[in-house]
UniProtKB/Swiss-Prot annotation:
Domain KH per the UniProt entry, residue ranges: 555-614
Domain S1 motif: 624-692
Reactions performed catalytically: RNA(n+1) + phosphate = RNA(n) + a ribonucleoside 5'-diphosphate
Recorded family membership: Belongs to the polyribonucleotide nucleotidyltransferase family.
Cofactor(s) listed in the protein's UniProt record: Mg(2+)
Family matches, as PANTHER family: POLYRIBONUCLEOTIDE NUCLEOTIDYLTRANSFERASE (PTHR11252), POLYRIBONUCLEOTIDE NUCLEOTIDYLTRANSFERASE 1, MITOCHONDRIAL (PTHR11252:SF0)
UniProt cross-references to Pfam families, sorted A to Z: KH_1, PNPase, RNase_PH, RNase_PH_C, S1
Protein name: Polyribonucleotide nucleotidyltransferase
Annotated Mg(2+) binding sites: 488, 494
Chain intervals for the UniProt region annotation (Disordered): 692-723
Length: 723
């Protein structure tokens, strides 16, 4: 495969080409994907020998290059650093549909790297990378039960669209990524605007039709350039040893698994395992470490099989619940006195404390990535400390799992967040998982809903989330509501659904089997809705609506609209004016280019004072209006009166009174308050005022009247006569 070969098809109205044989030839498999003007190189490498351990060491990397969008990276070094959240989420998105398609017992290390070379914003580099990952694997000698493909699906005015453009995505009420094989779906990730279960299912199946076509396209590539798959040694337990361990432990393991409380159940299972392992240690076998490792693996498989058999055949779960039963719920708001909003949500032995923080819009998150989004004002972060599962370990920066769970919660809540116009705040939610026995990401969504309501955020509707599970033995399957950790670990599916009472706002599905049929998806969505509505009813019994007032410790933000041409007046030369307002009131001021002014402070009185100052600065004088101002300067020809901050006018000496005035000081003194009427604003914007226009004129006998002095105002600019 030394010569370049190109395979082309159409994808969502754009040309898709796969190039192999020219780049990254030392990798086990590599493909350059051209989708429109988006270009992504994916290379896959598999180790020749198994790696020690009882897991499959698969690593998926997605590398964003800033040159792909014509940008220079920020920061001092001016080069790409740690992956962005979007890159991390994309790597997870690719990993999830690929991982189930490696054989059970495969222990060779596999690494897949997708590098983004060029980005056309209307041609998703993420979907190109997913396709490239599949192609790189299927044409390599790495054993892989693909191909797979993934597509984005949108819905505009009821019509489904594959790989929507940026413009189409803005109009769509569904943002769905679905992946799978020709036969079945094995990964779903979605955000939505309260869509029905039926609409979401239709979107998933619509996407699967396109996935089938892309899988057929890859079969053509495999036929032309695919390598023969290498022979590998899968980890398989010794049949005699397996039978021996089963005979000694099956009954005890079944009893231990039925222990309802998590910690007690874990202790009971551990006791069974220790008893069996100790019996083999006592035999003092020659290859003891290898035997003990194999026995430990067999015991875990027995634990898995017994749990699955209990659920599938007896329809009983380890904690004694029915298959559609939700664990006991409890919740509380306002636990933390100084934060802006807090919510504690507990479901069984899973507990999340969510905190809402409000800030001025200037504190939004700046996005320096490959997409068109420049900033976001709503964030949800998820933290999972070791103590939440009763374990010790180092505390590191958020990993892929924490970033992924935080993003899922953010997607679930995004639709109900009020617009900037309705609520001009940056909103940050942090969910601290304090206990975990499954479904902690969904607990964080419920806790975040409580925290926002407690903070007074006017969300469109409360949102709740639930995690569904599946145990499938042959053609028989059992769908589980509100799965706990053990059911997640040994089950076949983790299907998370979040939404309001009116529809779905987020959905995420990962499976460990080849795929799911439409029937199973339909039943899982229906059962998830029942659970979601039950949880929503509980949440609204704790707090049914946003608090009417924000926390005393939250910034109070007032908006004011001014003419864009007045912005310079508010800012002043070198920022002098705006800094003076900030110094005087202690507020924070942000001004948008359209003239929207945001004023933020914990003290509403200072907010109002800042508003009054700005209103005075941008206020325009109108002829005929009456003002009360202070005398700021006196000249021989009249007095200058400050009408409001930044604007003054001249009361000519002849406009002070109806009778003749000899000296200005006879009527007005410096600092006097005087009520005046605007009689003229000249072409240069200078304001002429009159005091006498507001005074009653005294009647005089005809003979006593004296000729009036000539009125002198600011000179008007005379236009030159045209010749």
């Amino acid at each position: 495969m030394s010569e370049k070969q190109v395979f082309s098809t159409e994808w969502a109205g754009k040309t898709l080409s796969v190039e192999v044989g020219q780049l990254a030839k030392q990798a086990s498999g590599a493909a350059l994907i051209r989708y429109g003007d988006t270009v992504v190189l994916t290379a896959a490498v598999g180790s020749k020998k198994p790696r020690p351990g009882d897991f499959f060491p698969l690593t998926v990397n997605y590398e964003e290059k800033m040159y792909s969008v014509g940008k220079v990276p920020g920061g001092f070094l001016k080069r790409e650093g740690r992956p962005s959240d979007r890159a991390t989420l994309t790597a997870r998105l690719i990993d999830r549909p690929i991982r189930p398609l490696f054989a059970e017992g495969f222990r060779n290390e596999v690494q897949i790297t997708s590098t983004v070379f060029s980005v056309d914003q209307d041609c998703s580099p993420e979907m190109a990378a997913m396709l490239g990952s599949s192609v790189a694997l299927v044409i390599s000698d790495i054993p892989f039960e693909g191909p797979i493909a993934g597509v984005d699906v949108g819905r505009i005015d009821g019509k489904y669209v594959i790989n929507p453009t940026i413009e189409q995505a803005e109009k769509s009420d569904i943002s769905l990524t679905v992946a799978g094989t020709y036969d079945a779906i094995n990964m779903v990730e979605a955000g939505a605007k309260e869509v029905s279960e039926e609409a979401m299912l239709e979107a998933i199946m619509f996407g699967h039709e396109e996935i089938k076509r892309l899988c057929e396209f890859q079969q053509q590539i495999i036929a032309a350039v695919g390598k023969e798959k290498r022979e590998i040694e899968l980890f398989v337990s010794d049949p005699e040893l397996e039978a021996e361990v089963k005979a000694a432990s099956e009954g005890k393991m079944k009893t231990a698994i039925k222990t309802e409380e998590k910690k007690a159940r874990e202790a009971a299972i551990e006791e069974v395992k220790e008893e069996i392992l100790e019996s083999y240690k006592a035999k003092e076998l020659e290859n003891e470490s290898e035997i003990l490792s194999e026995v430990a693996h067999i015991l875990e498989m027995i634990e898995k099989d017994e749990m699955r058999r209990l659920i599938s055949q007896d329809k009983i779960r380890p904690d004694g619940r029915k298959v559609n039963e939700i664990r006991p719920l409890s919740s509380e708001v306002g636990m933390l006195p100084r934060v802006h909003g807090s919510g504690l949500f507990t479901r069984g032995q899973t507990q999340a404390l969510s905190v809402c923080t409000l800030a001025p819009l200037r504190e939004h998150q700046i996005i320096d990535g490959l997409g068109t989004e420049e900033y976001k004002r709503f964030m949800h972060h998820y933290n999972f400390p070791q103590f939440s599962v009763g374990e010790t370990g180092p505390r590191r920066a958020p990993g892929r799992r924490e970033i992924g769970h935080g993003a899922l919660g953010e997607r679930a809540l995004q639709y109900v967040i009020p617009s900037e116009e309705e609520f001009p705040y940056t909103i940050r939610l942090v969910s601290e998982v304090l206990e975990s026995n499954g479904s902690s990401s969904q607990a964080s969504i419920c806790g975040s809903t409580l925290a926002m309501l407690d903070a007074g955020v006017p969300i469109k509707a409360p949102v709740a989330g639930i995690a569904m599970g599946l145990v499938k033995l042959g053609d028989d399957y059992t769908i589980l509501s509100d799965i706990q950790g053990m059911e997640d670990h040994f089950g076949d599916m983790d299907f998370k659904v979040a939404g309001t009472k009116d529809g779905i706002t987020a959905l995420q599905m990962d499976i460990k089997i080849d795929g799911l049929s439409r029937q199973i998806l339909d039943e899982a969505l229906t059962q998830a809705k029942e659970g979601r509505l039950h949880i929503l009813e509980h949440l609204t019994s704790t707090i049914s609506a946003p608090r009417e007032e924000l926390s005393a410790y939250a910034p109070k933000i007032i908006t004011l609209n001014i003419k864009p041409e007045k912005i310079k007046d508010v800012i002043g030369p070198g920022g002098k004016q705006i800094n003076a307002i900030i110094d005087e009131t202690g507020v924070k001021i942000d001004i948008e280019q359209d003239g929207t002014v945001y004023i933020a402070s914990q003290d509403q009185a200072m907010n109002r004072k800042a508003i009054a100052i700005i209103e005075d600065i941008v206020r325009e004088v109108e002829v005929g209006e009456v003002y009360t101002g202070k005398v700021r300067r006196i000249e021989k020809f009249g007095a200058f009166v400050e009408l409001f901050k930044g604007t003054d006018g001249l009361v000519h000496i002849s406009e002070l009174a109806h009778e003749r005035v000899g000296k200005v000081e006879d009527i007005l003194k410096l600092g006097d308050e005087v009520t005046v009427k605007v009689i003229e604003v000249d072409q240069q914007g200078r304001v002429n005022l009159s005091r006498k226009a507001l005074l009653e004129k005294k009647e005089q006998p005809e003979g006593d009247k004296k000729p009036q002095a000539e009125k002198k105002f600011y000179p008007k600019t005379k236009k030159p006569e045209s010749k």
